[in-house]
Amino acid sequence: MEVNNKYIRFDWAVKRMLRDKANFAVLEGLITVLLGETVTIVELLESEGNQETSNDKFNRVDIKAKNSKGEIIIVEVQLTRQLYFLQRMLYGVSKAITEHIEIGQLYDKVKKVYSINILYFDLGKGTDYLYHGKTVFTGVHTNDQLVVNTKEDEELRMRLPHDIFPEYYIIRVNEFNNVATTPIEEWLDYLKNNHIKDDTSTPGLKEARKKLLYMTMTDKERRAYDAHMDDIMVQNDVLETAKSEGRAEGRAEGRAEGRAEGIMSIAKNLKSMGYGIVDIMKVTGLSEEEIMKL
């Protein structure tokens, strides 16, 4: 019989616990399962989301790490809807590339980047909970894949473009409804339901069973964590209610005005609950001026 342990949510752990080198194994496990190869994190790099703030209800949480091969891995957790999320993914990867090459260095110093995005909102249409994107150059007339010459260790070698270009992983947590039987499914079960099997051997999760137990937190940490969970529950309730109202209005009117009013309804509800302008802008995509007029 399984012990019903309570585990700390991943977004909280990423922001406050997994940056500790003693806990790298949890994050390494997730990346290992996704990439299909053993990954060792050498160090964490500065990232925009590693600052702790009191008002982080809608903040993204991210970690930027370097592995033993010198590659850069970005792990981002996003709790709420972003209108231009793909553009932000691209910007984050581009910034990581340019930050880690000096002016005047040869292009062979450009680092491979992996962008892992864990989303708790509806990004769009799609039936899977895991999507993988990589760059492939396909012949327009021959349909073959281009292989390029590169110089490594003073030798010319053949490489596929996707060995050089960034790779993207999108994990749509809310779309996971499977029974967890594979390592990636066990990870999704934890990300969505905070559940970890007692007998798990999945990389990262066997370490998480020991390191991410709710009962190991101090009283102060528990109070902060419980408040965070309450914020998420209220936020989800407000957003779901407002989205339902927007859908109903859209169906009734059959016009774009209905969808626009739904967004306005979300903004009004969030504003009445005391959320800041910046947070409301992130959720709804409205401008500061539009929100101020509500």
Spell out what each predicted region is:
Residues M1-L294:
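Elongated, amphipathic alpha-helical interaction scaffolds
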